[in-house]
Amino acid sequence: MDDIHNCYRRTCIIIILSKSIIISNSDVKALIKHAKSEEPKESCALLIGNETEYDWNVKEVFLTENMDSSKINFTISPEQELEVDTIAKKKNMEIVCIFHSHPNSEAKPSITDKKFMSVNPFPWIIYSCESDQMKCFIFKNNTLEQISIKDS
């Protein structure tokens, strides 16, 4: 019997699945509408919900103002971030994702995005107005990882 268990232990393969962002189709549509309404500037938003071992589950979207009013950068004010964080905590949730748009480029992190992703350890959803694509990324262990976006 021990030989069977030892053989099993040696041949057992562990599969580690990446986490996903779970977000409703209506929230995705709201983010896209916000991005298109802010063109040619980048739009931004904070998404609140809960993180589990397997995913980040988005429950609410808070559209925010881009303080930079820029085509290539965005900044969410500390006051807006604090307000959203306070609302999330009252609902036993947390900020689980940062959203912003790229009006004239791909749905992938820019050099500036990567710099800020390293200090904001959330998944980042990026929507490209140019290609109408939405992708999600997280920067962890000095590595950029793409995360799947799933409908709730």
Question: PLM features: residue spans?
Answer:
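Short, well-ordered beta-to-alpha junction loops that form the rim of enzyme active sites
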Residues: S101
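Conserved beta-strand-loop surface patch within small alpha/beta domains used
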Residues: N6-Y8, C12-I95, N104-S152
